[in-house]
Amino acid sequence: KSRDGLLSLFSAFLSLLLVAALAAVIGFSLAQQKLRAPGPLASDKLLYFPARTDVPEILSKLESDGVIDAPLLMNLALWLEGNRGNVKAGEYLFKKDASLRDVMDMLVAGRVYLHALTIPEGLTSEQILQRLRENDVLAGDLREAPKEGLLLPETYRVPRGMSRSDLIRKMQDDQRRLVDQIWAKRDPSIPLRTPHELVTLASIVEKETGR
């Protein structure tokens, strides 16, 4: 009888384990389905999370703005995948019907929305700086303008909150690379001794043609 009792107890224990395992499998499957199912967002939405916005605040805003409808599940998935600390602040464009997985992947990868900022040819350095100061996507102050010809006129794609000084540095780096490429392919018969002379000449020509 004692042995029969132990067998019954062991059988009951195995049954409980089986039920628990089955429930876990079903729960995991349902959670995965929910993570990949189309979300509640009825149309594309642009949301901005300032620097140092924590995960609970991000989840709360995503829910209140109708991007997600299961913040607890998303929080749990981020934690289980070790990505809770990898969520990045910034401005994001969430697409219509974006799933929880879509939203998570975007936030973890930091795929922020980029704004187009066009700097046309013919502007002086001071005019370029004035355009950057007037652009409300950028942040931070600018002091004196760089020398003429050091900023590349181009269409730049910038994230909200990018510092104006960082963009100036990028414009200078891009211009330097372009000048180096042109200098390497220049006609040796042209009487220019340095890349700086090339930039100076280009600036003069640009000013004259822009009048």
Predicted regions and their residues:
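Conserved catalytic or metal-liganding residues and their short signature motifs at active sites
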Residues: 1-211
